[in-house]
C-alpha cells in the first residue's frame, strides 16, 4: 500500500533528514529536458498559452540561417556603395554571441554586466584590454541608458549583424586604402563615422528582412533553414485540452502560413495513427503583423485577414472570437478580451527578451517563458567541461589555505601570483569553450547583462518550449533559493558567537516573552486607564502573511 504525500509530510521533521542533495537530483529531469525557474509558476493556473513564431515555434537552423542573413546583408551594403571586397567575408558562428553592445562612437563590440561594467571589448577582430581599454572607457564602465550611443544586440536575428559590424570595423581599420580614426575612418577627403556605418548596417538588415529575399529564400529551402520537430503537434494538442492556445507573430500571413504548414507537415496528427490536421486547428486565436513591442502597449487596429489572398479586409474587426479567422494587428488587450483572460492567466512563450518577454511582463503581467536555443550548448559546456569548474574551486580553496592563519597583525605576504595566473588561465579556457566572446550568461564569475535580463523578466526559460512536454499541466515550477554570498559560502552548522564582538548577532528577533509583554502593557494601561490605548506592541503573525513566491497567492485561490 502506497503512502500519500500528505501522510508522509505529517512528520515534516523526517523530510530534511531523508531528502539530501543527491536524493533531490534523482527527481530532476535530464538537463536537456529541463525547464528552469526564476519565479514560481503553477501550471494549473494557466488558462492560455501564447506563442511567438520566429525562433520559438519555428527554430531556424544555425549557422545556416545566420549565414544566409549575413550574405544578403553584405550584398545589400555593396549595392549601396560599400567595397566589393566585403563579399569575401563569410559568417563565422564562433565569434558572435547575443547580448553584446555596439558602441557607435568608437566602433567597439562590448560585453557588459548588468551595471554596465566591461567584461570584453573588441575592435573588429582585435580584443582590447588593459590601458588601451581605459583610454576610451576610463572606468571600464558604460552608461547603458545612453541609447543614442550604445545599441544592444539582444536577438537571434542580431547575430549576423553582430559579426558583420566586427568585419566592417576590422576591414576599415586595417585596409591600407583607408585612414583609421578614433571615431571612424577616412577615404581621402571623405570621412565615415562608426555611427553612420552602424546606421547603414541597421538599414541594410531591415531591408533584407522586409523588402529583400530573406523570407523568399527561406521558404524555397525550408529543410535547410527550419527545424522540424514531430513533438510539436502533440504538445499543442495537449495544451489545447487544458486551455486556449494562441499565436501572436510579427510576420505577415503568407510567410506565417508557409512556415507553419511546413512545421505541421506530418502524415499523421498529434499522435501516430491519428489523422492529419491543418496547423490552424491547433490554435484558438491566430494573430499576424503584431508589431511587437508596440503590440503590448497601444497596439494597432485589429483587422481580419483574407486567408485566400493574404490581404487585409477593410475595416476594424469588432466581433467576438471566431474559429478559423486570422487577425492582423491589434494589441495584448485585444488578446485578453477575445480569449476572456487576464494577465496572470496567460503564459507567453517567445525568444525576444525585449519584444516578447520584457514588455509582456511589465505592461500586461503575463507569465513569461523565454526560449534560449543557445542554452543547449551552454549546458553541454557546463557538464562536459566540469573539470575546469572544479579546478577553479580547488584554486579558491588553495588561496584560502594560504591566508588561513593570518589576521591584521600578520606581516607575512603570501605569494599568490602563480595562483592568480592559473585562475586567469583556467577562466579563459572556460570562456573559450563557449566561443570567442565567451558564454552568453557569464564572463568568469560575473554574470552578463543578458543573464540579468533573463533572471529579471523570464519566469521560466529553456532551450526549447518543447521541454514542457515532459511536465504535467498540474506541475508547480518552484524557484530555487537565490543565495547571497553569506548564504552560499556559510555552512548550516552552529557557530558560537562572541556577543561582545557581535552584539547584534544574538539579538532575539524570533521569540517573545508574551507574559512579560502583557505585564508591561498592563502597567502602561493602568497609568492611562481612562484612555483606550492603540496597539503598543506588534504581535508575531500566527499565519502565513509573507509572499514567498510569485505564484502562491492564497487570496486568488479563495476567490476561485
UniProtKB/Swiss-Prot annotation:
Biological processes annotated in GO: adenosine metabolic process; allantoin metabolic process; amide catabolic process; dGMP catabolic process; dGMP metabolic process; GMP catabolic process; GMP catabolic process to guanine; GMP metabolic process
Domain of life: Eukaryota
UniProtKB keywords: Allosteric enzyme, ATP-binding, Cytoplasm, Hydrolase, Magnesium, Metal-binding, Nucleotide metabolism, Nucleotide-binding, Phosphoprotein, Transferase
Residue positions, PTM Phosphoserine: 418, 502, 511, 527
Residues annotated for IMP binding in this entry: 52, 54, 202, 206, 215, 249-251, 292
Pfam families per UniProt: 5_nucleotid
Function comment: Broad specificity cytosolic 5'-nucleotidase that catalyzes the dephosphorylation of 6-hydroxypurine nucleoside 5'-monophosphates. In addition, possesses a phosphotransferase activity by which it can transfer a phosphate from a donor nucleoside monophosphate to an acceptor nucleoside, preferably inosine, deoxyinosine and guanosine. Has the highest activities for IMP and GMP followed by dIMP, dGMP and XMP. Could also catalyze the transfer of phosphates from pyrimidine monophosphates but with lower efficiency.
Family membership: Belongs to the 5'(3')-deoxyribonucleotidase family.
NCBIfam families: HAD-IG-Ncltidse (TIGR02244)
Protein name (database record): Cytosolic purine 5'-nucleotidase
Name of the coding gene: Nt5c2
Amino acid at each position: 500500500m502506497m503512502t500519500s504525500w500528505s501522510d508522509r509530510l505529517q512528520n515534516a521533521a523526517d523530510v530534511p533528514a531523508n531528502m539530501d542533495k543527491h536524493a533531490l537530483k534523482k527527481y530532476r529531469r535530464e538537463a536537456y529536458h529541463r525547464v528552469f525557474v526564476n519565479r514560481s509558476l503553477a501550471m494549473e493556473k494557466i488558462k492560455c498559452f501564447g506563442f511567438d513564431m520566429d525562433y520559438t515555434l519555428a527554430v531556424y537552423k544555425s549557422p545556416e540561417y545566420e549565414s544566409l542573413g549575413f550574405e544578403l546583408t553584405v550584398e545589400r551594403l555593396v549595392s549601396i556603395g560599400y567595397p566589393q571586397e566585403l563579399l569575401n567575408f563569410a559568417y563565422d558562428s564562433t565569434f558572435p554571441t547575443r547580448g553584446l553592445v555596439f558602441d557607435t562612437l568608437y566602433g567597439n563590440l562590448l560585453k557588459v554586466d548588468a551595471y554596465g561594467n566591461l567584461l570584453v571589448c573588441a575592435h573588429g577582430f582585435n580584443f582590447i584590454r588593459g590601458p588601451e581599454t581605459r583610454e576610451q572607457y576610463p572606468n571600464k564602465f558604460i552608461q547603458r541608458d545612453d541609447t543614442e550611443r550604445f545599441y544592444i544586440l539582444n536577438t537571434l536575428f542580431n547575430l549576423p549583424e553582430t559579426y558583420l559590424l566586427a568585419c566592417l570595423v576590422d576591414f576599415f581599420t586595417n585596409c591600407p586604402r583607408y585612414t583609421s580614426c578614433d571615431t571612424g575612418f577616412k577615404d581621402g577627403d571623405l570621412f565615415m563615422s562608426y555611427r553612420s556605418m552602424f546606421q547603414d548596417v541597421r538599414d541594410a538588415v531591415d531591408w533584407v528582412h522586409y523588402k529583400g529575399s530573406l523570407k523568399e529564400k527561406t521558404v524555397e529551402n525550408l529543410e535547410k533553414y527550419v527545424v522540424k520537430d514531430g513533438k510539436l503537434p502533440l504538445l499543442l494538442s495537449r495544451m489545447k485540452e487544458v486551455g486556449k492556445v494562441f499565436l501572436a507573430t510579427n510576420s505577415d500571413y503568407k510567410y506565417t502560413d508557409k512556415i507553419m504548414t511546413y512545421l505541421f507537415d506530418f502524415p499523421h496528427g498529434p499522435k501516430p495513427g491519428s489523422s492529419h490536421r491543418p496547423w490552424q486547428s491547433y490554435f484558438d486565436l491566430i494573430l499576424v503583423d503584431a508589431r511587437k513591442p508596440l503590440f503590448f502597449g497601444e497596439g494597432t487596429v485589429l483587422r481580419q485577414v483574407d486567408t485566400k489572398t493574404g490581404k487585409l479586409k477593410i475595416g476594424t474587426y469588432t466581433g467576438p472570437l471566431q474559429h478559423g479567422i486570422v487577425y492582423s494587428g491589434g494589441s495584448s488587450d485585444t488578446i485578453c478580451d477575445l480569449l476572456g483572460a487576464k494577465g496572470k492567466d496567460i503564459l507567453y512563450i517567445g525568444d525576444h527578451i525585449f519584444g516578447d518577454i520584457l514588455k509582456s511582463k511589465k505592461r500586461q503581467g503575463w507569465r513569461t517563458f523565454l526560449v534560449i536555443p543557445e542554452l543547449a550548448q551552454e549546458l553541454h559546456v557546463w557538464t562536459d567541461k566540469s573539470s575546469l569548474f572544479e579546478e577553479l574551486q580547488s584554486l579558491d580553496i588553495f588561496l584560502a589555505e594560504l591566508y588561513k592563519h593570518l589576521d591584521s597583525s600578520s606581516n607575512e605576504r603570501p605569494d599568490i601570483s602563480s595562483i592568480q595566473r592559473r585562475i586567469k588561465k583556467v577562466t579563459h579556457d572556460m570562456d573559450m569553450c563557449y566561443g570567442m566572446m565567451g558564454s552568453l550568461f557569464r564572463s568568469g564569475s560575473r554574470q552578463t547583462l543578458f543573464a540579468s535580463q533573463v533572471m529579471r523578466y523570464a519566469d521560466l526559460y529553456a532551450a526549447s518550449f518543447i521541454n514542457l512536454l515532459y511536465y504535467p499541466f498540474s506541475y508547480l515550477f518552484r524557484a530555487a533559493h537565490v543565495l547571497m554570498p553569506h548564504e552560499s559560502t556559510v555552512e548550516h552548522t552552529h557557530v558560537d558567537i562572541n556577543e561582545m564582538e557581535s552584539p547584534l548577532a544574538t539579538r532575539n528577533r524570533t521569540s517573545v516573552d508574551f507574559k512579560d509583554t502583557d505585564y508591561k502593557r498592563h502597567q502602561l494601561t493602568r497609568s492611562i486607564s481612562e484612555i483606550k490605548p492603540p496597539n503598543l506592541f506588534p504581535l508575531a503573525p500566527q499565519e502565513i502573511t509573507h509572499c514567498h513566491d510569485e505564484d502562491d497567492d492564497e487570496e486568488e485561490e479563495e476567490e476561485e
